[in-house]
């Protein structure tokens, strides 16, 4: 189940950006509600969890999203970890900078799923081949599927 920060009314199909937050890399995906599909977009470098905000601003301007989705890294028992708080902080910063609604989605196993989709064994080669943006796609696709289920 996703949590919401100022969610807009879902009366029209929305364009949505999804983020797979990490301390060194942040994967980004784009999706929309017409076809309920998400696509990997890019991987941004971060320094200790601090992204290049200029790059994020460019993505916001380019895609003009209605909503932002941030993956929430939880332990398998649903308890929070260090990265959970950092991801929440990132989501709050996105909301504060861009005034867009933010929703968090449980991202457990999204990186595993991304590696399987890309048939990648090691983390280092996975980074080069877009594992973070693929994980963002998995996170965003989870949200889109939830929305489709809720509406039908």
From Swiss-Prot:
Predominant subcellular localization, coarse grouping: cytoplasm
Any one GO molecular-function label of the UniProt entry: nuclease activity
Statement: the UniProt record of this protein carries the keyword Zinc: no
Domain of life: Bacteria
EC number(s) stated in the UniProt entry for this protein: 3.1.-.-
Subcellular location: Cytoplasm
Record's GO cellular component terms: cytosol
This protein's record includes keyword Hydrolase: yes
Family, as annotated: Belongs to the YqgF nuclease family.
NCBIfam families with a match to the protein in the record: RNAse_H_YqgF
Record-given protein name: Putative pre-16S rRNA nuclease
Species of origin: Nitrosococcus oceani (strain ATCC 19707 / BCRC 17464 / JCM 30415 / NCIMB 11848 / C-107)
């Amino acid at each position: 189940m996703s949590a919401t920060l100022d969610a807009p009314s879902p009366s029209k199909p929305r364009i949505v950006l999804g983020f797979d937050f990490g301390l060194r890399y942040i994967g980004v995906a784009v999706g929309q509600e017409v076809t309920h599909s998400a696509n990997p977009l890019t991987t941004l470098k971060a320094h200790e969890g601090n992204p290049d905000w200029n790059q994020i601003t460019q993505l916001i301007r380019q895609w003009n999203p209605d909503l932002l989705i941030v993956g929430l890294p939880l332990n398998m028992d649903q308890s929070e970890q260090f990265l959970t708080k950092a991801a929440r902080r990132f989501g709050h910063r996105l909301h504060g900078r861009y005034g867009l609604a933010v929703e968090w989605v449980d991202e457990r196993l999204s990186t595993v799923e991304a590696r399987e989709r890309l048939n990648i064994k090691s983390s280092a080669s996975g980074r080069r081949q877009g594992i973070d943006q693929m994980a963002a796609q998995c996170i965003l696709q989870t949200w889109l599927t939830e929305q489709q289920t809720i509406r039908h």
